[in-house]
């Protein structure tokens, strides 16, 4: 929930004109096994929702999945079709010790700062705080856009980084709503009753940001990477039908990938469902 995919996409936009990029991911909850390189016939279930999202958005990069990252990197470097790769971006490998990266980037959620957290099971940390010393770059994500200079200084001191480590701050920018099934854009949702539909790790930020932008908002949340079953689709249909007119559903790009493959959504739901891209 720290914003790995938007930051990987930012790096893709930053680098793709200069170098040939491959994204290598674990491919969480995919149905395939081993190493898979995405092509024009690849489906979401082959590589997972987030890799598939990037595969759809960026046609000039390679997207591959492999739980064994070293094997995945070796395949990218040795296979004829991908041997022109200059940079491999791994979206969740800070603790994958078999990989020795050229640059380590650590993302820290502004709302869940690791300096105030504890190790599992008391907190959410998977390793001691001292592990942050492996990072070349630390990014505090999901910051308020009006972060004051004093808070920059306080956070910089609290993070207690080494001189060689760079610290950056990022915030979320929302793009124009786009129809999940129709492709139509919706510039302003302020007059709509909204069902916010999410299956992500940390939906509260999105709820907080969207609430002032719409007439009224109800939320329907599922677990991260949730695969929508028939009973879930029924809940979505019923929750949408219960909203007053005019009404729409807003969901994330990642959820839209899975919802497009779901069966049983009412046509009225499909026509009124929008994804909210973030950068």
What are these regions (language model features)?
Residues 20-24, 106, 193-197:
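Conserved beta-strand elements of the Class I
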Residues 27-163:
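Phosphate/Mg2+-binding loops and adjacent switch elements
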Residues 247-254:
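Acidic beta-strand-to-loop metal/phosphate-binding motif
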